[in-house]
């Protein structure tokens, strides 16, 4: 252990440079590192705020055993075989994040790239899948609809391949957008992202018995209009199905019995289910209807089908490796240290809104306005954030604060925990609730 620790700290980061250590000094720092990594993270909470801290070294990311985005940019990232292979975090400083986004990509000799658009109905689990593929939670996730309000971008970089994930809002109709006074971005962003897509991932939550039997009209319309873009079907939460025969039926319906140009052979598998027809492909026209037939409910041009279990990370890993393998020869768009195009402030605001959607009843979270009044680095390298939550009614103030301030304190703690994993530093967050004047 001492030898490994000594090798791990042969280079000590000093401001924006590195200092070479001798064998004796390296062993001393290795011993300190070992004791620090054995320390348990401390957690201190207070009314309407939370503070999370842990052991600290020269870099805020070091006590997590991970490399920050700026470490990658400066060439200080940990090599393969370090404590973890998780992706870099996001810098807490907006100027550092902006610098990384515009920096020339550190491409290998034979780079490959793939732009992937995730499509699905609202609340289908697109952001959850994006976070799993990225290895970090950078997109907000909630059981309520319209958590993702505009197009967000995530980047996976491994070896020669770079996959750019476009996490789009759930596809909605113009009628619904007007009826609920939703942002125009919820209607337009999925269509805009399709114009530059190399691959479309259509996500269906098979645990939702109300929506799982067919692709939404908006998804079908999008697939039809951009039929030249290759697409795959991802069926999520298959472990929630008690009868696996239902999974076969759903597969046949959502693909119209055809995958990669070949008819699915399901008759033998479904033989134990009396009266269950074996679906066969039908001839289709250019729109979303069958020629001389009923409204189309599936898409017969999927190249592959992936079935994901909510409990298994291996399924997500298989999908990730498939996406990396589909990358085509071409220049990277981003430096390998980029995880997302979002600013640190946007990430924070989205995570706070996620918790509001999670904890507040009915339509109340949609009326909360967020205003960041402090964002700075503390004396010990921690991130200090203060945000005001503005609500339109006095009753909303009482609900959001909760009895003895428990609810707002719980929200602050949960947000701080998520942000610490994203920014790879300690986080002190204070939330205050004000009546909107």
From Swiss-Prot:
Residues 360-437 form the KH type-2 domain. This is GTPase Era, mitochondrial. One of its GO terms (molecular function) is ribosomal small subunit binding. The modification Phosphoserine is found at residue 173. It is a peripheral membrane protein. Residues 167-170 are annotated as: G3. The gene is ERAL1. The lineage of its organism: Eukaryota, Metazoa, Chordata, Craniata, Vertebrata. The keyword GTP-binding applies. NCBIfam families: small_GTP.
């Amino acid at each position: 252990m001492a030898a490994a620790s000594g090798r791990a700290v042969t280079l000590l980061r000093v401001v924006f440079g590195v200092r070479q250590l001798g064998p004796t000094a390296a062993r001393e720092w290795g011993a300190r590192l070992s004791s620090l990594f054995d320390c348990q993270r401390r957690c201190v909470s207070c009314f309407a705020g939370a503070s999370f801290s842990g052991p600290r070294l020269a870099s805020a990311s070091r006590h997590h055993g991970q490399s920050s985005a700026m470490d990658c940019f400066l060439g200080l990232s940990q090599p393969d075989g370090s404590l973890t292979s998780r992706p870099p975090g996001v810098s807490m400083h907006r100027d550092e994040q902006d610098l990384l986004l515009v920096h020339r990509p550190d491409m290998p000799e034979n780079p490959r790239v793939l732009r992937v658009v995730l499509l699905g109905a609202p609340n289908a689990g697109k952001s959850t899948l994006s976070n799993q593929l990225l290895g970090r939670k950078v997109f907000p996730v909630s059981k309520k609809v319209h958590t993702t309000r505009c197009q967000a971008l995530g980047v996976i970089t491994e070896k020669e391949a770079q996959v750019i994930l476009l996490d789009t809002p759930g596809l909605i109709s113009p009628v619904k957008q007007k009826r609920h006074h939703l942002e125009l971005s919820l209607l337009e962003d999925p269509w805009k992202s399709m114009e530059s897509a190399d691959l479309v991932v259509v996500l269906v939550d098979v645990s939702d018995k109300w929506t799982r039997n067919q692709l939404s009209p908006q998804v079908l319309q999008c697939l039809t209009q951009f039929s030249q873009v290759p697409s795959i079907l991802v069926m999520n939460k298959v472990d929630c199905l008690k009868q696996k025969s239902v999974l076969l039926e759903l597969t046949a319906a959502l693909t119209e019995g055809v995958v990669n140009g070949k008819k699915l052979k399901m008759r033998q598998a479904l033989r134990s289910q009396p009266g269950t027809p074996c679906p066969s492909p039908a001839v289709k026209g250019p729109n979303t209807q069958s020629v001389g037939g009923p409204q189309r409910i599936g898409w017969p041009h999927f190249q592959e089908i992936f079935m994901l279990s909510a409990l298994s990370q291996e399924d997500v890993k298989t999908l990730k490796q498939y996406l990396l393998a589909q990358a085509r020869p071409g220049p990277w768009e981003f430096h390998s240290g980029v995880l997302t195009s979002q600013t640190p402030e946007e990430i924070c605001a989205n995570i706070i809104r996620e918790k509001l959607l999670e904890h507040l009843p009915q339509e109340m979270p949609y009326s909360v306005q967020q205003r960041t009044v402090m964002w700075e680095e503390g004396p010990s390298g921690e991130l200090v954030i203060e945000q005001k939550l503005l609500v339109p009614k006095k009753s909303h103030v009482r609900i959001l604060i909760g009895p003895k301030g428990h609810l707002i304190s719980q929200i602050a703690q949960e947000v701080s925990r998520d942000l610490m994993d994203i920014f790879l530093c300690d986080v002190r967050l204070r939330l205050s609730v004000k009546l909107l004047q």
